[in-house]
């Protein structure tokens, strides 16, 4: 499924995918392991899934959608008050905005706009840290320090969160 010099844009609802070329023009992708140990089974990851499901259930009372990814940022903002629990609202916001960031990231890659791609990565980390709350202090230090390095276009946590890469 993977293809050299390409990212994969995967729709997790349909499993449809498309390739987005990655043209780095001398730039490098660096993956850093924070060495923080975690277990997705026993971590708060399952709580995040449940909170996101609650956000979806609540917003479905005012929107005819199947997934949070069916909403645009603007639609979410217009209907977010239907999500009564503040934590669930943050989780829902992350899901909607992250989906929109991903769509924009694919467009940026296809247009060879690596700067925009990097900014979207940065925004993704901020959302994972502040709205989905799956980052940790060790990863935040790595990301914050990367942002200070001249030439770094983007930095974010990857994987299930709560440590790791």
Indicate where each model-derived feature is located:
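Glycine/serine-rich anion-binding loops at beta->alpha junctions
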Residues: 151-165
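C-terminal nucleotide
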Residues: 2-154
